[in-house]
């Protein structure tokens, strides 16, 4: 499994040779550095720990300062571990760039979705509204919530109004349309979670379908 962290730049569109337009999300994947190598011999499994984003030394706790110094790099704001079949080709302090992926690769993109605040059931869960006529008292309310005297309660998981968004979301099996090696950019087909400048995790998809 290959993986990088990046920052969402925004969306645009590109045209192929036949003039077909494809909406893409632009993700900048600069500043990825290997901070630790884990192997079967030392940890019982193979993985590569990657750090992303610069962080001031004064804001980094002493144990992590030593961790980054051992890897020969500066403190990083975010760290993520990617499981790999083999750690060959990876070394501590190595900088990972966009060439880790190629056009046509399928990836999963994970990010924190946009926060929407407190929302009702129509926006939050896609429920239908009631009649909007003058005589109706039921427009955008949740409606019936349960049964009668038995069980006499609302079941857990019932779709109700509440806080919407600001949770971790993964968009699966997205295609990388283009890789810009000069600017360290990945152009991924479609939309991905999160706002502009949001930190994303891009890794090989778990759905190895056709």
Curated annotation (Swiss-Prot):
<dbReference type="Pfam" id="PF00297">
    <property type="entry name" value="Ribosomal_L3"/>
</dbReference>
<keyword id="KW-0689">Ribosomal protein</keyword>
<feature type="region of interest" description="Disordered">
    <location>
        <begin position="123"/>
        <end position="144"/>
    </location>
</feature>
<dbReference type="GO" id="GO:0019843">
    <property type="term" value="F:rRNA binding"/>
</dbReference>
<dbReference type="GO" id="GO:0022625">
    <property type="term" value="C:cytosolic large ribosomal subunit"/>
</dbReference>
<comment type="function">
    <text>One of the primary rRNA binding proteins, it binds directly near the 3'-end of the 23S rRNA, where it nucleates assembly of the 50S subunit.</text>
</comment>
<dbReference type="GO" id="GO:0006412">
    <property type="term" value="P:translation"/>
</dbReference>
<dbReference type="InterPro" id="IPR019926">
    <property type="entry name" value="Ribosomal_uL3_CS"/>
</dbReference>
<comment type="subunit">
    <text>Part of the 50S ribosomal subunit. Forms a cluster with proteins L14 and L19.</text>
</comment>
<keyword id="KW-0687">Ribonucleoprotein</keyword>
<protein>
    <recommendedName>
        <fullName>Large ribosomal subunit protein uL3</fullName>
    </recommendedName>
</protein>
<dbReference type="GO" id="GO:0003735">
    <property type="term" value="F:structural constituent of ribosome"/>
</dbReference>
<comment type="similarity">
    <text>Belongs to the universal ribosomal protein uL3 family.</text>
</comment>
<dbReference type="InterPro" id="IPR019927">
    <property type="entry name" value="Ribosomal_uL3_bac/org-type"/>
</dbReference>
<dbReference type="InterPro" id="IPR000597">
    <property type="entry name" value="Ribosomal_uL3"/>
</dbReference>
<keyword id="KW-0699">rRNA-binding</keyword>
<dbReference type="InterPro" id="IPR009000">
    <property type="entry name" value="Transl_B-barrel_sf"/>
</dbReference>
<keyword id="KW-0694">RNA-binding</keyword>
């Amino acid at each position: 499994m290959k993986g990088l962290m990046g920052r969402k730049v925004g969306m645009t569109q590109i045209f192929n040779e036949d003039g077909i337009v494809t909406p893409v999300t632009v993700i900048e994947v600069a500043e990825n550095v290997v901070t630790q190598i884990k192997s079967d011999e030392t940890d019982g499994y193979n993985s590569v720990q990657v750090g992303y984003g610069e962080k001031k030394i004064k804001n980094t706790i002493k144990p992590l300062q030593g961790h980054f110094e051992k890897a020969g790099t500066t403190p990083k704001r975010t760290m993520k571990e990617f499981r790999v079949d083999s750690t060959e080709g990876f070394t501590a302090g190595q900088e990972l760039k966009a060439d880790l992926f190629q056009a046509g690769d399928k990836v999963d993109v994970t990010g924190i979705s946009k926060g929407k605040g407190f929302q009702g059931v129509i926006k939050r869960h896609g429920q239908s509204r009631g009649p909007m006529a003058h005589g109706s008292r039921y427009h955008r309310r949740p409606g019936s919530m349960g049964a009668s005297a038995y069980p006499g309660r609302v079941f857990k998981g019932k779709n109700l109004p509440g806080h919407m968004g600001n949770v971790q979301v993964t968009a699966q099996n997205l295609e990388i349309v283009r890789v810009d090696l000069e600017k360290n950019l990945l152009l991924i087909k479609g939309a991905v979670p999160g706002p502009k400048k949001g930190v994303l995790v891009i890794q090989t998809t778990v759905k190895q379908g056709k």
